[in-house]
Amino acid sequence: MNLIFKKKSYNFKLSTKVKNSKTTYLTKSGWIIKLTSNDKKIGFGEVSPLLEEDLKQCAKQLNMIPEYVRVFNLSEQINIFHPCIQSAINSALAEINGKIIFKKTITLMKLIKQPYF
């Protein structure tokens, strides 16, 4: 199966700060990925690493994925990617294959309807 791969970055300020034992987070950054199959089935995934160095690594790795990709190639090479990217790809593929069904939220749909996506 051939897939079309698209990504859209986001960055927004959190309404309240989020703390863990090491860091306080004021913003959320990442990407929404969209995979579209030959038969126009669509799957989405979110890439949202917490650490700045992981965010940079994910940016580089997402740019390695071509716009047109075979599902076999993606499945074979998924292990080279950061775990956040692996999770996003697996989520998108599962949605395409009907293994998971997400309710589309207004916020996500607004993001997706942007001209680039």
Residue ranges and their predicted role:
Residues 1-117:
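N-terminal capping/lid subdomain adjacent to the active-site entrance of alpha/beta enzymes
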